[in-house]
Amino acid sequence: MIRLASEKDVKSILEIIKDAKAFLKENNVNQWQDNYPNEDTIINDINKKQLYVYEEKEVLAFIAIIESIEETYNIIYDGKWLNDDSYLTIHRIAVKKEARHCNIASKLFMYAIEYANKRNIKSIRVDTHRDNIVMQKLILKHDFKKCGYIYLKDHSPRLAYERLV
């Protein structure tokens, strides 16, 4: 079941983040290796009602689905976005270590696509680190197109993708 996250989920989500950081580090991906995302990030997402959890008896995964404009997407390099209309942004997706390879991340992506459809939002955007091959495969599996790259606020480059809905 996918539902909005609540404050009672914070501990479980932070454990999933810890797992994800270790996985990324083991795979030489310099993403989430600082103090991000952290408890404040998660609580902010919960308060804004933009964090969702996948639950089967316990929280196994989470995803942030954001309807507001993503500042770092205002300028895209070596390409262009597919759509200039409204869009959703997918951020902060991770699956509990024991639940990897159970297609849960795909279910969360499909949920985001359905979410956009129901709200008549024209597209979904997502970005990831160039070394995060697992995430790139997930993004492409769901028919996102690589549009170029963007820079985060800390000036780190990210591959930028979009899917028309």
Show which residues each predicted segment covers.
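A short beta-loop-alpha structural element at the N-terminal edge
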Residues: 1-15
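Conserved GNAT-fold acetyl-CoA-binding loop/helix
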Residues: 21-41
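Conserved beta-hairpin
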Residues: 49-64
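Conserved acyl-donor/pantetheine-binding loop and adjacent beta-alpha core of acyl/acetyltransferases
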Residues: 64-94, 100
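Conserved acetyl-CoA-binding loop-helix of GNAT-fold acetyltransferases
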Residues: 95, 101-114, 137-141
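Conserved beta-strand-loop-alpha-helix junction that forms the acyl-donor binding cleft
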Residues: 100, 126-135
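Conserved GNAT acetyl-CoA-binding A-motif
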Residues: 109, 116-128
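Conserved catalytic-core motifs of GNAT/GCN5-like acyltransferases
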Residues: 127-128, 140-159
